[in-house]
């Protein structure tokens, strides 16, 4: 955990590279599957209960700004943190995504858990957080158990399992390359690594 904290601080305070880095398999990335996705994509695995995911938010925001136009950015919430509320907040993310209010809701949930230290204890608490973010509670009610949201949650679990995700935050590029952040020294180096993996053909 201490290593991850040092890494995150380094990524945030060192925005520019002095030289173009050389990225190597099993040092900067791992191959987790043998085939690429049909179209270029970056998938972030995260949990609202993960403090490092919260600290990673500005880094991911900068990454999204710099991704090529043809690259799809996806977020996959995992259910293995947060005990019984883990799956509930995984479903909450799906609701926010379906209602196209994720950018409003995610900061509110992260703040409640990571800054205020007062995580939601029930679906009613989650609903209240949506309302705090400006979402009509009735819209939440109509979506939370919908077929669409249930299907999204099932896909999140399939992604987590098929890519063998055991820790967050994790970033997978083109469904094949798992980013290793241990040796990354800045946000720009992290983004350069992601772009490098997007271009890999082997």
Regions found by a protein language model. Give the residues of each.
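Extracytoplasmic thiol/disulfide redox context detector
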Residues: 3-82, 157, 161-162, 195-202
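Aromatic side chains
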Residues: 29-30, 45-48, 93, 110, ...
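Generic detector of short, locally flexible boundary/turn motifs and exposed helical patches
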Residues: 37-43, 58-60, 92-93, 132-138, ...
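Solvent-exposed, acidic/flexible segments
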Residues: 39, 49-56, 82-89, 98-102, ...
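C-terminal cap of thioredoxin/glutaredoxin-like
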Residues: 47, 132-202
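Sec/Tat-exported extracytoplasmic proteins
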Residues: 49, 64-67, 96-100, 109, ...
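Extracytoplasmic/secreted envelope proteins and their assembly/folding machinery
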Residues: 57-64, 86-93, 106, 123, ...
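Structural microenvironment flanking redox-active thiols in thiol-disulfide oxidoreductases
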Residues: 67-98, 103, 107, 111-131
């Amino acid at each position: 955990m201490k290593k991850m904290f040092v890494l995150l601080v380094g990524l945030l305070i060192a925005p520019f590279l002095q030289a173009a880095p050389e990225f190597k398999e099993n040092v900067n990335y791992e191959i987790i599957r043998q085939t690429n996705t049909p179209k270029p994509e970056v998938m972030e695995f995260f949990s609202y209960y993960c403090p490092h995911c919260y600290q990673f938010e500005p880094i991911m925001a900068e990454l999204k700004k710099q991704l090529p136009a043809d690259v799809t950015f996806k977020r996959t919430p995992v259910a293995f943190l947060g005990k019984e509320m883990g799956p509930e907040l995984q479903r909450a993310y799906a609701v926010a995504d379906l209602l196209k209010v994720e950018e409003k809701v995610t900061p509110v949930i992260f703040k409640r858990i990571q800054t205020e230290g007062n995580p939601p204890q029930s679906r009613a608490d989650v609903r209240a957080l949506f309302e705090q973010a400006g979402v009509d509670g009735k819209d939440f009610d109509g979506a939370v158990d919908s077929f669409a949201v249930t299907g999204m949650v099932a896909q999140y679990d399939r992604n987590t399992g098929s890519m063998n995700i055991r820790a967050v935050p994790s970033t997978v590029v083109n469904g094949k390359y798992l980013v290793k952040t241990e040796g990354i020294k800045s946000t720009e180096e992290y983004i350069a690594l992601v772009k490098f993996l997007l271009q890999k053909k082997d």
